[in-house]
Regions:
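Thiamine diphosphate
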Residues: 1-164, 169, ...
Length: 312
């Protein structure tokens, strides 16, 4: 049996930026002294004249990006999720979103899988913060293929986009001929009749594995990849809820305000069904190996399986 290919989506982000740079002269990449970690150093090497290191000054970087967008450039401002959504929130809101500027934010190292860097760098609140900003698209890819497609789609979208990428290498799950990416459109990865599992990011692969464990117990789970949290694919979410009668959301984010919040808001108005939110339960993360943290917070396949089985 061949080993499953694993790639960190931050590496996919860096590779995708190079392809964008080759195709579009107006792409500019900005960094805040983290080009190696965000994997945008590859773009810097290929297009040094279109890479700007703003230093450890994330607020200035976002303001700089807004200025570039106002002159017709398409800037990709890159830093850790904690700094992109947290430290620079005011600039994202007032300098980018309020004037509706065409700035793309590449936020790497999101969630607890950042690992040993600990709670100060494990941003589990970024979806909630960015979802609340008017006009902001919020997305998180499940693998290498989806991450690259997302970067291209973000370029094509006119307006601000927040994309979260991960540090941890994750399985490639979208390597199939019929794969199609579109912002705001979810993807059904597994059909099922007993309940629906809705996930994004690295939790998609774990949810698929959990679904197989559930199947062995006679529980048939539908699995949907909702890579775009805003705008949410409400049509797909509502249809799945009506079809299966129960919904579980899984995300490497607080259960407050992220994918789980978006799904609950939608279903409360359009298709009320029982919902279980799996994620970070109103606590901070801690330092440790990524795999150990995912297990501790119930976000590995076994943890998801146990929580879903208890819910059903």
């Amino acid at each position: 049996m061949s080993e499953v290919k694993k790639i960190a989506t931050r590496a996919s982000y860096g590779a995708a930026l190079i392809e964008l740079g080759k195709k579009y002269d107006n792409v500019v990449v900005l960094d805040a002294d983290l080009a190696a970690a965000t994997q945008t150093g590859m773009f810097k090497k290929e297009f040094p004249e279109r890479h700007i290191d703003c230093g450890i000054a994330e607020c200035n970087m976002v303001g700089f990006a807004a200025g570039l967008a106002a002159t017709g450039k398409v800037p990709f401002a890159s830093t850790f999720a904690m700094f992109a959504a947290g430290r620079a929130f005011e600039q994202v809101r007032n300098s980018v979103a309020y004037p509706k500027l065409n700035v793309k934010i590449g936020a790497t190292h999101g969630g607890i899988s950042v690992g040993e860097d600990g709670a100060t760098h494990q941003c589990c609140e970024d979806f909630a913060l960015m979802r609340a900003v008017p006009g902001m698209v919020v997305a998180c890819p499940s693998d290498d293929i989806e991450a690259k497609a997302m970067v291209e789609a973000a370029y094509q979208h006119v307006g601000p986009v927040y994309m979260r990428f991960g540090r941890l290498a994750v399985p490639v799950i979208n390597d199939r001929p019929d794969y199609k990416f579109e912002l705001g459109k979810g993807i059904v990865l597994r059909e099922g009749k007993d309940l629906t599992i809705i996930a994004n990011g690295l939790c998609v692969a774990a949810s698929l594995e959990a679904a197989e464990k559930l199947a062995a117990d006679g529980i048939d789970a539908k699995v949907i990849n909702i890579h775009t949290i805003k705008p949410l694919d409400e049509e797909l979410v509502v249809a799945a809820a009506k079809e299966t009668g129960k919904v579980v959301t899984v995300e490497e984010h607080s259960v407050i305000g992220g994918l789980g919040g978006a799904v609950c808001e939608c279903l409360a108005e359009k298709a009320p069904v029982p919902v279980k939110r799996i994620g970070i339960n109103d606590v901070f993360g801690e330092s440790g190996p990524a795999a150990a943290l995912l297990e501790k917070y119930g976000l590995d396949a076994e943890g998801i399986y146990k929580q879903v089985k208890e819910f059903v």
